[in-house]
Amino acid sequence: SAPDELVLAQASRFYHFRDGVLVSISDAYDNRLRLCRDRSGRIERLDNGAGRSLLLRYELDRIVAVDYQVHRAKGREPYVWETEQNLVSYAYDEHGRLVCATNAVGESERYRYDDQHVILERQLAGGASFFWAWERSGKAARCVRHWASFSQMDTRYAWRDDGRVTVHNADGSQEVYVHDQRARLVQRIDPDGATHFKSYDDKGRLTVEQDPMGAVTAYQYDDAGRLVALFPGDDEPTSYEHDNGFVRVVRRGQAVWKYERNEQGDVTRRTDPDGEVTDYSYNKHGQLTGIWYPDHSCHRLVWNERGQLLEEQLPNGGIKRYRYDDLGRQVAREDEHGAQTVYEWDSVGRLIRLVLPGGSCREFSYNPYGKIIAERDELGHVTGYEYADGLHLISRRLNADGTQVKYRYDNARLLLTEIENE
């Protein structure tokens, strides 16, 4: 860090401040995400230091778009940031509330609020809508009904001031949740009457839980809040020994696992209960580069400067290779026999074409939930998929031979209840 930097550490993340402003976030290997700001002090760019960044665009002090950019140079010209694609766009109403979010292929979610700026409706890109009704206002607001545009979901909440809430589901079933004064769940009663209990210590850590069958699991912590013992009731207890904040030894009955770590906390040697040793090595960025197994075989991994896996040298001597596009998506894979598979993706990272080693291909189409609606196989046969009520759950599969399979979801949890197969 620079002499004028303030660094705050939290777990394996380090937050770097200069003049009271966050300028970068780093990990134990000093990989850094840099935050570049505009003249107004707003975060304008998130730069990973490897030629890739996210550009944040603003209007009226609100983020309206996020662009994925690549650092490029043409010929001998200086490097400049070029937008590879827009990832997401945002729209707001006159009160500054988010009302629409649109992804790279134009699929949009929409939002509606009450006059207290509490959300009332969320409409998904696939067509389904969710609604909320509230009681009270401000930070005391709590949901009393949550329902959807499809009939299976309509849930009502009956709150009591002692931390107890009863959930009434659309199918007539009920669930009960009981919280303590610090809003921690201490009891849950399932629709079938099964009861779960939880207890906590004065620091908010879970110490005991009991399942509906009466089995009790207990947890024990050290002064730093690290789990040092787990007592699973009728099973053997497990203990954990720590060193510099990381687990060094695990004991369960007579079995013992031991771990050696580097300065960053990654495991460099693992010894199992049989005394078998596995070693691990890492590069300067913290990526795994080698695994040495107990039989003395070795698995090596090669990475590029952008953190992408380029090559695997397998223990049997075979080599796998990988290629990526400018958006970081894998576009080709070569197996240990030299056979190559090619992948094509849409703008939101959904696989749309797969070219197999023999040259045949499979193609896929999707709905806004990322679910397949059509699949063309190597012989040109097309299988279609339909989804009812604007949901992500398949309602009918249309096979290439003309047959079909129907699916029904009839309960409040949208679980599959019936399959009709021709």
Residue ranges and their predicted role:
Residues 1-422:
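Extended charged/polar low-complexity repeat regions
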